[in-house]
Amino acid sequence: MTRWWRSRYICRSQCSNVKNSTCSQQILYIHLLILSYTTITKSFFKTLNHHQKSMFKVIRLKYIFEINSCISHPSILDLYVLKNTILLIL
């Protein structure tokens, strides 16, 4: 099981009892964050030009913002642990 799938499973189990329509969308952003950082290696990042690197950093900030929004929801505070795990991956 890859890191992304393992994290996805954790996300779903943490969020399984939440009756909140935004939860699944926010979890999707977390999945995308995990996927983007586990598939883009440092060597690939070095091949990007300045504009591409800037765009990538903007996307990174957007996803981190979404994670913070997600974990601030009282029903899914358990995702705080997952968020810290993701930030360690970064």
Swiss-Prot record:
Tree of life domain: Viruses
Protein name: Protein A54
